[in-house]
Regions:
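Conserved Rossmann-fold NAD(P)-dependent oxidoreductase catalytic core, especially the SDR/UDP-sugar
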Residues: 104, 130-176
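Flexible, glycine-rich beta-alpha linker
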Residues: 151-153, 176-177, 201-219
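Conserved C-terminal active-site "lid" loop/helix of NAD(P)H-dependent oxidoreductases
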Residues: 249, 279-282, 304-328
């Protein structure tokens, strides 16, 4: 990734909202999923905190694809505060690391990959977390699990969902492999907390977007900006009336670190920007307007339809995480503009 001045500024400004970030000083933080949309930004934010505060945070990037990690972070992999660790979520893990914090973000989240590999989606979520929970228990580490707003399922009404609002999931639909695995993983976390006093905390991100998405990410909020950068209009395969909680990736990273520091043991926290609860269509229009392009409509194929998120409303409340002192900075129009500007200057 090309670290543009705008991206660096976005990360720095979002990091300024983290309450009590001095708590991270001198800590060892082990992060999975750092090649992906969310946790790559978390790594960038931790490096920024080190640069700004001389915080001495040791960042361990767990990866099963070293070349992809090096491609993502470039020469930053050579920094003294960065250590790359071979890691596969489905295999036993042994490393001479005693982390203070574990951030577990490794998970299939791409809708196309989920539908093509539902079994692997379940296994990687459950097996990977089980291994890390054992490490957290043994090493007395705090483990933050990155779950998903999809755990809420389908629920009547259009009000934003709070952390206790649970709806219906069709467990015989293979597309449910992802939310079902995430639900099970959350229960594993609180079960370890109950039985072994393991220090766990959970975040449930809404729909996260930004310039750190991977090339293979087929989610609409990643595909749309890629198409615009290629000079294409946005093609929507539905009316786009579903309500979503969108959150710019820099705000999501600061939310994760805020919960890591101040979240209550055994609790779950939504990650949502209350100023970016919009429909998929409105999200598409924000990106199109920023690029001076159009939103056009087409009919989805059968294979495309089966990968769709079935929730008509996955908007989330943010009051619980805001009670920790966190706040989002970037609304949807600004986030769309920044995403496109950063991607253009990264080519």
């Amino acid at each position: 990734m090309n670290y543009t001045l705008l991206y660096i500024r976005d990360i720095s400004e979002a990091a300024s909202t983290i309450p009590c970030r001095e708590t991270l000083r001198g800590k060892k933080i082990f992060i999975t999923g750092a090649n992906g949309l969310i946790c790559s930004a978390v790594v960038d934010m931790l490096m920024t905190i080190n640069d700004e505060d001389h915080a001495g945070i040791s960042i361990f990037i767990a990866t099963r694809n070293m070349s992809k990690t090096i491609q993502r972070f470039g020469k930053r992999c050579e920094r003294e505060d960065i250590t790359l660790v071979n890691y596969d979520a489905t295999q036993p893990f042994h490393a001479d690391i005693k982390p203070d914090y574990i951030i577990h973000g490794a998970s299939a989240a791409d809708p196309k990959a989920i539908m093509e590999h539902p079994t692997a989606t379940i296994k990687s979520n459950i097996q990977g977390l089980s291994i890390l929970l054992d490490i957290a228990t043994k090493q007395n580490s705090r483990l933050l699990y990155i779950s998903s707003s999809e755990i809420y399922g389908i629920k009547e009404g259009g009000e934003p969902l709070s952390e206790n609002d649970y709806g219906y999931i069709d467990i015989l639909n293979p597309r449910s492999c992802y939310p079902s695995a995430k639900r099970t993983a959350e229960t594993m976390c609180v079960s370890y907390t109950k039985e072994y006093a393991t220090d766990t905390v959970i975040v449930r991100p809404g729909h996260i977007y930004g310039p750190t998405m991977t090339d293979s990410d087929s989610r609409a909020s990643s595909q749309f900006p890629r198409d615009l950068i290629a000079g294409k209009d946005i093609v929507m395969k539905s009316e786009g009336l579903q309500q979503r909680s969108y959150c710019y990736v820099a705000d999501c990273a600061s939310a994760i670190l805020s919960v890591l520091i101040k979240g209550e043991r055994g609790e779950a926290y939504n990650i949502s920007n209350k100023n970016s609860i919009v429909s998929i269509r409105q999200m598409a229009e924000s990106f199109a307007q920023a690029a001076h392009k159009q939103v056009v409509f087409s009919t989805a194929s059968k294979s495309e339809k089966v990968s769709f998120n079935m929730m008509s409303n996955s908007s989330l409340t943010s009051s619980k995480i805001e009670s920790l002192g966190w706040r989002a900075l970037t609304d949807m129009p600004t986030g769309a503009e920044h995403t496109l500007n950063i991607l253009r200057n990264s080519q």
